[in-house]
């Protein structure tokens, strides 16, 4: 579902607002030496997906990444696996500087964030997609909203604020208003 949202969003944004393609020089990408010869990574394309806390249209250095997802695409079958990296995970950001992993994007933009993922997780990421809050709202609207399906037995554990969310659909504006908050007040 997330990959579908990102693909639809990238298409929508490219058609409606324009996409800025930023190339990172190959020599600026850091990978562990063992990664190049790792047979397990052959036939896969790994892409970093960043959701940044940018209320304006700036998507580069200076914005913390609220969401970090690695999309691993099997080039033979087309299967996609997504792995979320918790933003508060304490990792080496480079030069033996340890911090929450979302600080890598703030300190050095997508280049440092990709290098942080490659170094700590033994990956070969060279490509990325970044979406800010405005882009997120546009993506959600473009696909007709997002349905959040939380089961009754899960609600009690979600900040103890929710009453019911089963089948609730929000448009981009409402989702945008609640994204990044510590809790979401929901009514039936």
Sequence positions of predicted segments:
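Conserved protein kinase catalytic core
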Residues: 57, 80, 92-93, 138
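Entry/capping segment at the start of metal-dependent catalytic domains
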Residues: 1-78
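Flexible, solvent-exposed short loops/turns enriched in glycine
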Residues: 81-108, 167
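Second-shell loop/turn segments in exported
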Residues: 56-59, 99-107, 120-127
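Flexible, polar/acidic helix-loop-strand segments at domain edges
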Residues: 39, 141-188
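Short helices/loops that flank or line small-molecule/ion binding pockets
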Residues: 116-119, 137-143
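Extracytoplasmic
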Residues: 42-45, 63-68, 77-85, 96-98, ...
């Amino acid at each position: 579902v997330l990959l579908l949202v990102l693909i639809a969003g990238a298409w929508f944004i490219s058609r409606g607002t324009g996409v800025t393609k930023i190339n990172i020089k190959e020599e600026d990408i850091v990978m562990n030496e063992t990664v190049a010869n790792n047979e397990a990574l052959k036939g896969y394309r790994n892409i970093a997906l960043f959701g940044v806390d940018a209320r304006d249209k700036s998507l580069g250095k200076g914005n913390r990444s609220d969401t970090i997802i690695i999309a691993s695409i099997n080039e033979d079958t087309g299967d996609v696996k997504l792995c979320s990296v918790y933003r508060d995970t304490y990792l080496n950001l480079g030069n033996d500087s340890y911090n929450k992993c979302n600080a890598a994007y703030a300190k050095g933009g997508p280049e440092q964030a990709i290098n942080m993922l490659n170094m700590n997780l033994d990956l070969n990421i060279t490509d990325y997609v970044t979406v800010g809050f405005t882009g997120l709202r546009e993506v959600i609207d473009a696909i007709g909203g997002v349905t959040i399906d939380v089961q009754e037995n899960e609600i009690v554990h979600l900040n103890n604020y929710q009453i019911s969310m089963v089948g609730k659909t929000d448009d981009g504006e409402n989702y945008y208003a609640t994204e990044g908050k510590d809790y979401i007040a929901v009514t039936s």
